[in-house]
């Protein structure tokens, strides 16, 4: 009995990253040996993603409410610079996608579209959807995972409870801690869940279906890697004035890997919260910035929209000048920030961007169909970039603020 307890303790206290890597390797091996066996363990992945999606809304709600209610007077949350980084990162990602698309022009084999999809008819519809998400019923927001509504209601409750009695605010803080402990337990199950996700992905799709879209995937993934490994580190360096790569690699390893396989920014919110706690960031800051980042920090989505739209333009022989490409970057950035307000996310915002070039909705929906075909890679890479960048920018803004405060304190003394 003691040996079993000791083994479980070693597993529970072992390196989560190494365990996740082991789960990935075992999932690939199982899928290559037995497709049936891989399909049989697919439920492990579904359970893990389901658990994350179930706990994430209540986690965000209580953390936001608790952090605002218990916020000390004159304390800084650093939200303004973080939002600035989110918007800058999304726009630069779209611009990078334009440059990659011009450097490596890609054409598509367009055949049939996707039936039963309803893309937004314009940017006003995206904004309209987002506004109605803000005034969503709080219970419905929690049930459906509407993080815009959850943020608004959590912030509203926190503000109104800011002047409540200390015992009430302490109770809210205790509930927040209890939910956080449940999240830690769920995250420890990540190796098992990712094992099931990897096995199911390889068994169901493999990579044969992606062979015909090699160049498109190279442009998409290449743009995302360039943002993750070059642009984001430059932005972070400007903020913190030191080597950014230890922070960048840690976030990619501990947030990006999980997000790559769950393919859900919402499901990765608890993972990012735990990483922020490990990095010893200010709780009042990350409890708001992480769920907000899952909503508006969409560099990966901006890349997807831009690359596929320009691929459609190249396929149809449409000449794209610099100013039009710049306008596309702006449209892709704004659209990407609204991707969480559209069922189907970034792919169904492609027709909106295609309309800039006069591309018909029928052709645009064929481009969306291509997006669904390569989704096993595109969606995974997009989510990994989006989610890991949330932590990177939050950490950079927090560290820059701390350095500024330390400098001011030194000048005063």
UniProtKB/Swiss-Prot annotation:
The terms describing its cellular component in GO are: plasma membrane
Q: Which GO terms describe its biological process?
A: serine transport; threonine transport
Q: Name one GO molecular function term.
A: neutral L-amino acid:sodium symporter activity
**InterPro entries reported for this sequence:** Na-dicarboxylate_symporter, Na:dicarbo_symporter_sf, Ser_Thr_transp_SstT
Q: Which reaction does it catalyse?
A: L-serine(in) + Na(+)(in) = L-serine(out) + Na(+)(out); L-threonine(in) + Na(+)(in) = L-threonine(out) + Na(+)(out)
- Domain of life, per UniProt, equals Bacteria
A single Pfam family it belongs to is SDF
* Transmembrane segments annotated in the record for this chain: 11-31, 43-63, 82-102, 141-161, 192-212, 216-236, 298-318, 339-359, 363-383
Tell me where it resides: Cell inner membrane
Q: Which Gene3D superfamilies match?
A: Sodium:dicarboxylate symporter
Q: How does it sit in the membrane?
A: Multi-pass membrane protein
- Which UniProt keywords are present, listed alphabetically? Amino-acid transport, Cell inner membrane, Cell membrane, Membrane, Symport, Transmembrane, Transmembrane helix, Transport
Family assignment from sequence similarity: Belongs to the dicarboxylate/amino acid:cation symporter (DAACS) (TC 2.A.23) family.
Its biological function?
Involved in the import of serine and threonine into the cell, with the concomitant import of sodium (symport system).
What is the protein name stated in its UniProt record?
Serine/threonine transporter SstT
Q: What organism does the UniProt record list as the source?
A: Shewanella frigidimarina (strain NCIMB 400)
């Amino acid at each position: 009995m003691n040996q079993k307890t000791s083994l479980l303790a070693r597993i529970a206290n072992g390196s989560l990253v190494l365990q996740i890597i082991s789960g990935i390797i075992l999932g690939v091996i199982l899928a290559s040996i037995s497709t049936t066996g891989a399909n049989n363990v697919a439920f492990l992945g579904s359970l893990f993603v389901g658990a994350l999606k179930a706990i994430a809304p209540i986690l965000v709600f209580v953390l936001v409410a608790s952090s605002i209610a218990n916020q000390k007077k004159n304390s800084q949350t650093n939200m303004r610079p973080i939002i600035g980084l989110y918007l800058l990162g999304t726009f630069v990602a779209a611009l990078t996608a334009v440059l990659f698309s011009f450097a490596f022009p890609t054409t598509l084999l367009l055949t049939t579209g996707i039936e039963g999809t309803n893309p937004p008819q314009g940017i006003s519809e995206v904004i309209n959807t987002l506004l109605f998400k803000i005034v969503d019923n709080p219970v419905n927001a929690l049930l459906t995972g509407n993080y815009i509504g959850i943020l608004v209601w959590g912030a509203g409750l926190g503000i109104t409870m800011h002047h409540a009695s200390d015992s009430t605010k302490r109770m809210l803080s205790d509930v927040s801690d209890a939910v956080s402990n449940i999240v830690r337990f769920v995250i420890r199950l990540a190796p098992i869940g990712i094992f099931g996700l990897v096995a199911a992905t390889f068994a169901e799709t493999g990579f044969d279906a992606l062979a015909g879209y090699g160049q498109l995937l190279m442009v998409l993934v290449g743009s995302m890697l360039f943002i993750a490994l070059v642009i984001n580190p430059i932005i972070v360096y400007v903020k913190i004035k030191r080597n950014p790569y230890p922070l960048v690699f840690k976030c990619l390893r501990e947030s990006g890997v999980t997000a790559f396989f769950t393919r859900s920014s919402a499901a990765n919110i608890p993972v990012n919260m735990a990483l922020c706690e490990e990095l010893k960031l200010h709780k009042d800051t990350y409890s708001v910035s992480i769920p907000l980042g899952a909503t508006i920090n969409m560099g990966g989505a901006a890349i997807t929209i831009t690359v596929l739209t320009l691929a459609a333009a190249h396929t149809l022989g449409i000449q794209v000048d610099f100013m039009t490409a710049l306008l596309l970057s702006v449209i892709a950035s704004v659209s990407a920030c609204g991707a969480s307000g559209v069922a189907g996310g970034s792919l169904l915002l492609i027709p909106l961007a295609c309309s800039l070039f006069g591309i018909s909705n029928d052709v645009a929906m064929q481009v969306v169909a291509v997006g669904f075909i390569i989704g096993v890679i595109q969606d995974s890479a997009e989510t990994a970039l989006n989610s890991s960048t949330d932590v990177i920018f939050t950490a950079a803004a927090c560290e820059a603020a701390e350095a500024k405060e330390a400098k001011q304190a030194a000048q005063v003394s």
